[in-house]
């Protein structure tokens, strides 16, 4: 029978503690029987070390009775020596050989808790919700402390649907964002991201800016409200709003584009993902006269949007070509993924509106960004932070990895 023991080291972190512990373990093995390292976890939190090591030994046939007791006694002497030499505390306890096999059944998931700041009740609520559906938190690590604080909990023994349902109420009552992602290679294998433009990549709605310059803001607002109430579909409402722009000088498009304000964190998100090898693009129900120059400015790989018809230097109030609506956005995602040879499960889509839902559902990860409740409820996960680069934490990237990927002189 294999004898196993857990050594727990705590104290002020300093160079050489881990090396001294494992060197001492090697000597124990030499004195008795070979010692094997079964498991190791180490974390340093604000200079305080917590190191856990599970070691085991398998006595040879014909070994003397009491071998396990001698093994534990040797580890006890080791703990005292390492503790004195390193200024740390080392505890030793026997553990069950089947301890690792006793973990809850089910696939593991990452639960990401984000906030500005993260209140204790958010972590408490998440932990209670996880335990309430039979899950277990195996590990916690901080992903970022800026621009949002975020923590990643590795959870076993709970299914994604149950986790999302249990955590949704916690997010609603605490104001924190809580995302769920399955542990595995697919999380870090994402290779393409598609972003909505209005109220996602940029602040505000381009068509509202154009309508204001045309003196038709109130009319366009009424059409938008009718669409939101289900009285018009997106294509009908788009045509009606574009018709209200008839006669507007084409130069106004340049003026509006020059005054666009990127959502905070947009440049950081795109630059980081580009340096990590992502294909990045935009899919918009807006207009190519705005989105194409924006895509070029940001170094994006692709863009899809509607095209305003122009005649004699003025908008005609019509559109050219196929309309990019809810279905059109989803088709664009599929087209871009196929062009770059990337499976849909390795794609990410980010948007805020109902016309983004098909795209969010098709992507491997669909993120509702500052969206209305019915959009948040149907997306894989939701972010209500003002910073677009919080998407990086949902993907599992730490603040340190982001800083390594983006030059410090870059603007957000």
Question: Where are the regions that the model predicts?
Answer:
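Asp-based phosphoryl-transfer active-site loop
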Residues: 190-207, 352-355, 360
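A metal-dependent, Asp-based hydrolase signature
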Residues: 209-272
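Active-site pocket-lining segments that scaffold enzyme catalytic pockets across diverse folds
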Residues: 157, 198, 267
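Conserved active-site and cofactor/substrate-binding residues in soluble primary-metabolism enzymes
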Residues: 12, 16, 20, 66, ...
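A conserved regulatory-domain signal marking ACT and ACT-like small-molecule sensing domains
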Residues: 1-190
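Residue-level recognition of short loop/turn positions
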Residues: 196-198, 229, 312
């Amino acid at each position: 029978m294999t004898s196993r023991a857990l050594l727990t080291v705590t104290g002020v972190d300093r160079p050489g503690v881990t090396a001294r512990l494992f060197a001492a373990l090697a000597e124990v093995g030499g004195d008795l029987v070979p010692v094997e390292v079964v498991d190791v976890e180490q974390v340093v939190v604000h200079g305080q070390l917590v190191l856990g090591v599970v070691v085991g030994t398998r006595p040879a046939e014909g070994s003397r009775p009491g071998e396990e007791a001698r093994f534990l006694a040797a580890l006890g002497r080791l703990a005292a020596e390492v503790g004195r030499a390193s200024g740390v505390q080392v505890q030793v306890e026997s553990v069950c050989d089947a301890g690792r096999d006793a973990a809850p059944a089910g696939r593991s998931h990452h639960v990401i808790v984000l906030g500005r700041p993260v209140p204790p009740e958010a972590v408490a609520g998440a932990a209670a919700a996880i335990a309430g559906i039979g899950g277990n938190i195996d590990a916690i690590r901080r992903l970022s402390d800026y621009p949002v604080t975020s923590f990643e909990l590795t959870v076993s023994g709970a299914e994604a649907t149950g986790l999302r349902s249990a955590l949704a109420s916690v997010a609603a009552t605490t104001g924190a964002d809580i995302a769920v992602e399955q542990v595995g290679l697919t999380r870090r294998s994402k290779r393409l991201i598609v972003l909505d433009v209005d109220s996602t990549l940029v602040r505000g709605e381009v068509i509202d800016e154009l309508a204001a310059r045309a003196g038709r803001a109130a009319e366009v607002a009424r059409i938008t409200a009718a669409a939101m109430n289900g009285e018009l579909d997106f294509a009908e409402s788009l045509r009606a709003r574009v018709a209200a722009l008839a006669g507007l000088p084409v130069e106004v498009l340049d003026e509006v584009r020059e005054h666009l304000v990127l959502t905070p964190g947009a440049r950081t998100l795109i630059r980081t993902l580009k340096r990590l090898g992502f294909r990045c693009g935009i899919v918009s129900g807006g207009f190519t006269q705005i989105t194409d120059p924006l895509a070029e400015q940001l170094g994006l790989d692709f863009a899809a949007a509607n095209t305003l018809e122009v005649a004699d230097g003025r908008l005609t109030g019509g559109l050219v070509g196929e309309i990019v609506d809810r279905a059109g956005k989803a088709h664009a995602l599929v087209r871009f993924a196929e062009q770059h040879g990337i499976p849909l499960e390795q794609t990410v889509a980010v948007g805020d509106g109902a016309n983004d839902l098909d795209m969010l559902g098709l992507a491997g990860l669909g993120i509702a960004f500052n969206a209305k409740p019915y959009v948040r409820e149907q997306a894989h996960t939701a972010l209500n932070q003002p910073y677009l680069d919080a998407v990086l934490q949902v993907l599992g990237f730490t603040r340190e990895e982001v800083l390594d990927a983006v030059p410090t002189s870059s603007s957000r």
